[in-house]
Amino acid sequence: MLLYLENENKKGKVSDKEVHLYKHNGIWPKDTPKPRSPDYIGENGKIKYPDDDGYKIPPKPREITLKKGMKLDRYGDNLGSFVCPFKEKKGVMPYEKRSLPYENNEAMQKTYKRYEALEDINMESVERKIKMSGNDKLIEKIKELKEKNKFHSPKIGKISPHFDQEGKGTQIKLPISVENLMQLDFIKQIP
């Protein structure tokens, strides 16, 4: 069993032994984002995320079209699909408002990234561009998401309190991962 820090990717995984050491002795690999508590790690070695994709309900999150030029940010690698709106005048949304499972330490701060939308992003534009790309893996991924009724336009809503964090920030769940949106030239990473 491995604890995957982000979307079961191959980088950032932590071995059974390391999870065991953390759960029993509080020891965690130095350069890896550290969960706030061993209690947030399930028996399967994965983070136990809140229900409803971490949205504070009511109200339910609403589907939107991300407009060209909109700025976004996130902590973590590009394999995730959750971002926050970034507004120059307000600056970075405070970490505790994001209800993330990891400690706000140097390893986590190194994962912070910002992005800009290069064109409007919604369910239709993503599906159209994926079909045009001829990328069989992405085409199959969209088919599977549709079958599970999990393919949607970006959803925006308030973040629920979780992981001993206050929440109350705003999050957006993208239709596919940041990495996939970058591959399709929907968004780019910015300084």
Regions found by a protein language model. Name each.
Residues 2-191:
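Catalytic toxin/effector domains delivered as secreted proteins or via bacterial secretion systems
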